[in-house]
A protein has these predicted regions:
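Beta-strand-enriched cores of mature, soluble protein domains
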Residues: 21-167
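Positively charged n-region of N-terminal signal peptides that target proteins for export
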Residues: 1-4
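Bacterial N-terminal signal peptides
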Residues: 9-16
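Composition-driven detection of intrinsically disordered, low-complexity segments
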Residues: 7-9, 25
Length: 167
C-alpha cells in the first residue's frame, strides 16, 4: 500500500512540475494596414493575394515592424491560406512566421490561425519550430489588428526575454 501511495505522489508531483515548466507564454500584438487582391474564379471560389505592413509589440517588451505576404483561397465557404510574415525587432534581429487559417474567413469578422516560427535570428532562433495560435480582425479603411500567443517553458521564455545581442 505504501508503494502505491508513493508512486501516486511521485506521479502527481511529476505532473505538477511538468505543468510548471510549460506555463510561460509570449504574446504578440500587431496593428497595421492590409490589402487583398481578389479573383472571383468561379461561383463559390475565390483566390486572394494578401499583403500587410504594421507594428508589433510583445508582452516581454520587444517591439518592431512586421510585413506579410501570402495567399488565401475560399472554396465553397472553406478558407485555406499560406501567409509568411517577416518581423524585425528594434535591434535588427528578424524572424519569419508562417500562418494558416484554421477557422473563419476573410469576409467574416475574424479568423483564427495556427502559426509557426520558421526562421529566426538572435533571441528568435530559440523558438524556431514553435507552434502557436493567433486571431486576426479586419478593421475599417484596410486596417487590421492581430493577437497571437505561444506557450513555452519558463526557461525558454526567460532566455528569449533576457537575450543580449553580441557586440
Amino acid at each position: 500500500m505504501k508503494k502505491k501511495i508513493t508512486i501516486l505522489l511521485v506521479f502527481i508531483f511529476t505532473i505538477f512540475l511538468i505543468g510548471k515548466s510549460f506555463s510561460a507564454q509570449i504574446t504578440i500584438d500587431a496593428y497595421g494596414m492590409d490589402k487583398y487582391f481578389n479573383y472571383d474564379v468561379d461561383k463559390g471560389r475565390q483566390f486572394l493575394t494578401y499583403s500587410s505592413e504594421g507594428l508589433f509589440v510583445t508582452n516581454i517588451g520587444i517591439n518592431g515592424v512586421v510585413e506579410c505576404k501570402g495567399i488565401v483561397e475560399i472554396i465553397t465557404g472553406i478558407t485555406s491560406s499560406n501567409i509568411m510574415c517577416k518581423y524585425a525587432e528594434d535591434n535588427g534581429d528578424i524572424f519569419f512566421a508562417q500562418f494558416f487559417i484554421k477557422r473563419g474567413t476573410v469576409s467574416e469578422d475574424a479568423t483564427v490561425q495556427s502559426f509557426e516560427f520558421v526562421s529566426g535570428e538572435g533571441r528568435w532562433a530559440e523558438i524556431v519550430g514553435q507552434k502557436c495560435i493567433g486571431a486576426y480582425t479586419p478593421m475599417a479603411q484596410e486596417r487590421f489588428m492581430w493577437k497571437g500567443k505561444c506557450e513555452m517553458s519558463n526557461k525558454t521564455l526567460e532566455r528569449v526575454k533576457n537575450y543580449k545581442k553580441p557586440d
